[in-house]
A protein has these predicted regions:
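Signature of multi-pass transmembrane helix bundles
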Residues: 2-26, 39-48, 70-232
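Juxtamembrane helix-boundary/capping and inter-helix hinge elements in multi-pass membrane proteins
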Residues: 27, 62-70, 99, 146-151, ...
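Hydrophobic alpha-helical segments of integral membrane proteins
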Residues: 30-45, 153-171, 196-200, 204, ...
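Membrane-water interface of transmembrane alpha-helices in multipass transporters/channels
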Residues: 33, 73, 193-201, 226-238, ...
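Hydrophobic transmembrane alpha-helical segments of multi-pass transport and channel proteins
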Residues: 44, 80, 84-88, 208-212, ...
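Membrane-interface alpha-helices at helix entry/exit sites of multi-pass transporters
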Residues: 69-75, 166-173, 263-279, 305-308, ...
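Helix-loop-helix junctions within the multi-pass membrane cores of secondary transporters/permeases
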Residues: 243-321, 376, 383
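Transmembrane alpha-helical segments and their short flanking loops
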Residues: 291-385
Length: 385
């Protein structure tokens, strides 16, 4: 008999529902147990994030530099540009729509009236370095490894990257539902749940429409460059889109994406190079979601949204997304450091970001992999021979 298994999205949603349902029922002593766990887990996240940035970004830059063929550089640059366009499109849409959907300062008002359950104890786990220090160190090491012929340091960082992957996949991701449950439980206990849940529903609706618009834009550009019908190109990629909706994994969708990309007239060698690479480095859908969710939470807190601050955040987020691990929730985990250092997000805001992001994980993944087909069409226009 096949064992029934709930996916990460299902576990996150279940954790939120249970937390918000039980917050007004469970005694304070029980709620404080989960608040204590959340405090410890948040400290661990704060410790691991700088290591995550160094462990992912440095070897990613080194790999790109060592394999610096023209097609690789062109694909990487195109993926970064597509990610930035998606991020800025999300910013413009959110800035125009969210103020009419979200009550400014709703979260701050709820927090002011809240009576949070205090943890039984806390343990401070100081990070080894700040997030910006980690980013600068990652750039220096990555560029250095790309220009130094030795393989020893590169081998060390490949092993370090594998340790980070396993820490995310075996420790952080499995504990996320419990972390989200604790956050939702405390929000319901303190009376903040209803305001936040109402906003969540509105945000998800906007992001769903926005990710469709981004795909249409990408294929219009690809069709214009390749002199092809963009709607036909997009229609042929629908099997990859729906496969990604089901699997929530860019890597698992590669065979379908590859097949449909070739069916779109892309040279098999070009498709075989671009599709697996973009499954790792092209995260337009993920960037779209992170920017929109961040702006929604900032509005809920009554924080003034400054374009220059958000522009810097999107530019840095694009770099982090190129190096994000290909595991469920990997993109948002990689983005936590930038959210904290550039937007000032604390533990509760980061937990809300994780919950929102993973609740829509299939939309983002589908947008990412379907967009890979558009990038392949563009690259094929210049490198098909």
């Amino acid at each position: 008999m096949k064992k029934f298994k709930i996916g990460l999205v299902g576990r996150i949603i279940l954790a939120m529902v249970l937390g918000m349902s039980l917050g007004g029922i469970l005694p304070e002593k029980v709620t404080r147990v989960f608040t204590t766990f959340n405090g410890l887990f948040s400290q661990f996240l704060g410790f691991i994030i700088p290591l995550l940035i160094v462990g992912l970004v440095a070897p990613a830059i080194a790999d790109i530099g060592k394999k610096a063929g023209r097609m690789l550089l062109a694909t990487t640059a195109l993926a970064y540009i597509a990610t930035l366009i998606s991020g800025f499109a999300s910013y413009c849409t959110s800035a125009g729509i969210f103020p009419s959907l979200i009550e400014v300062g709703a979260l701050t008002q709820a927090q002011a009236q809240a009576n949070d359950a205090a943890p039984y104890f806390t343990i401070e786990i100081a990070p080894l370095m700040g997030v910006m220090t980690a980013l600068i160190l990652a750039f220096i090491l990555g560029l250095g490894m790309a220009n130094v012929r030795g393989i020893a340091l590169h081998g060390v960082f490949n092993d370090f990257r594998e340790i980070i992957y396993r820490t995310i996949g075996k420790v952080i991701i499995p504990l996320l539902p419990l972390f989200i449950f604790g956050i939702a439980l405390n929000m319901a206990y303190s009376g903040q749940a209803l305001a936040i849940l109402t906003v969540f529903i509105k945000i998800i609706g906007v992001i769903f429409v926005l990710h469709i618009a981004v795909l249409l834009f990408q294929y219009c550009v690809a069709g214009l460059i390749a002199r092809r019908n963009p709607l036909k190109l997009l229609f042929r990629m629908l099997p990859a889109y729906f496969t990604a909706l089901g699997t929530q994994s860019s890597a698992a969708t590669i065979p379908v994406t590859l097949r449909q990309t070739v069916a779109n007239g892309v040279n098999a060698d070009v498709a075989g190079f671009v599709v697996p690479l973009c499954a790792t480095i092209h995260l337009s859908g993920s960037t779209l979601k992170i920017v929109a969710c961040a702006m929604a939470i900032m509005l809920m807190q009554g924080v003034a949204i400054d374009f220059t601050q958000m522009a810097g955040f999107i530019l840095m987020l694009g770099v982090v997304m190129v190096a994000a691990p290909g595991v469920p929730g990997g993109a948002i985990m990689a983005a936590l450091g930038v959210l904290h250092s550039m937007l000032g997000f604390g533990d509760q805001e980061q937990a809300l970001m994780i919950a929102l992001y993973i609740a829509m994980d299939n939309f983002g993944t589908a947008c990412n992999v379907t967009g890979d087909g558009a990038l392949a069409v563009i690259i094929n226009r210049f490198y098909k021979s």
